[in-house]
Amino acid sequence: MQNPQNPPPAGSAADFYSQMPVKVMGTPGAPGSQSTPGAPGAPGQYPPQQPGAPGSNLPPYPGTQQPGAPGAPGQYPPQQPGQYPPQQPGAPGQYPPQQPGQPGYPPQQPGQSGQYPPQQPGQPGYPPQQPGAPGQYPPQQGQPGQYPPQQPGQPGQYPPQQQGQYPPQQPGQPGAYPPQQSGQPGAYPPQQGVQNTLAKTGAPGQPGVPPPQGAYPGQPGVPPQQGAYPGQQPPMGAYPPQGQPGAYPPQGQPGAYPPQQQQVAYPGQQPPMGAYPPQQGAYPGQQGAYPGQQGAYPGQQGAYPGQPPMGAYPGQQQYGVSAYSQTTAAYQTGAYPGQTPMGVYPGQTTAYAAYQTTAIGYGATSTYSYTRPTYSYATPYSRTAAFVVPVGLPPHVVQKMMAASAAFRIHDSNCSGTLSKKEFKKLIKHLGYYFSKGQTKMLFHSIDRDYSGSLSEREFVDWWSMQ
């Protein structure tokens, strides 16, 4: 058997991992055989044997220490006091300090200045555990000016417990709110009336003796006052008055509204003086009716609204005679629109002017048409030229015709020199008159004297000059 090669250099990694006890089998005493156990190996043998018993621990790795050996200062973890973490408490600056009396955080035994929290009273700190020191929170024993005071009765505290404060805990003090014991001046509500010092001699409830101050009607010993509510006779001017002149609501007195115990003026009764309606006579139809002319409503003398005598509403003597054709109509002379005397509807002597059917009674009809005036024009009509008025007209008629021509040309949208029914309706509204569709149609056909279905400028101007 050939021996292995020389071992690796001492201290190398190969040497560290290859040093293992090797047992060589051979004859004792023979050359090359291993010595007996316990004898140190010869130098140069492999593996090299260390002094000591066989199987002893191998030497540690360089730079390492065996477990359990105390460490050198600066190592981690330090095993000696003064290191971090300290294993033996009580050294200054350590964390946590285990011995009392040393400054540190947190202190285990209270009472030291600057510690948190202070356990002994009398030291400034937060929060104090035993009250009574000024400036501590919360104060358990009330001091003047503190909030909230625990013991009442000190000035300026809240809530005050003594009189004059808000809310008072002991009732019956003047000015307190609410007073718990009645009978104090200014108390609310008074429970038992205080006798008026200015009251006349006598027991409450007697005539001439006023009730106690602050008493409410209906309490024992409180007499009913004059004008009390309900059911008593009130003084003059009380509310509600019972039968006094001018009161509201009065009960049967002259001038009352409404009179309860008088003849009623509506309808047909003879009213009292000052009743409503104030005129003598019924409403409607009696003398002095409302409004105050003699005659009924409508159609009598002095009717409403104020027509001439014997005129109905509007413009009738009575029902069935000339309903809309009288000269005494409600629409008076020249009213609608801009008519000459005796004309109501433009240019007519009847209430409805141009081409209208006037009811005479019920059933009979009559027609009245517009008569166009005859004017002499010097030149033929031209839509592109300015309108030429007839010869020999007064200035005010000329002015009306020029205004009508200007309005006509505004609504002649197609510059044809004629107006359709729709354009004519807009023109009438432009001039400030508003008719129904049927009225506008009748007026249109009354002006259209040539039956062309449209209005020429001269037809319209001639009609307007008559208004």
Curated annotation (Swiss-Prot):
Residues 1-10, 45-62, 75-109, 118-131 have a biased composition (Pro residues). InterPro entries: EF-hand-dom_pair, EF_Hand_1_Ca_BS, EF_hand_dom. The keyword Ribonucleoprotein does not apply. A motif (XYPPX) lies at residues 45-49, 75-79, 83-87, 94-98, 104-108, 115-119, 125-129, 136-140, 146-150, 157-161, 165-169, 176-180, 187-191, 221-225, 238-242, 247-251, 256-260, 275-279. Residues 63-74, 132-145, 153-193, 215-246, 253-311 have a biased composition (Low complexity). Pfam families: EF-hand_7 (PF13499). The keyword Ribonucleoprotein does not apply. One of its GO terms (molecular function) is calcium ion binding. Keywords: Calcium, Metal-binding, Repeat. Ca(2+) binds at D412, N414, S416, T418, E423. Residues 1-311 are annotated as: Disordered. Residues 399-434, 435-467 form the EF-hand domain. This is Calcium-binding protein P.
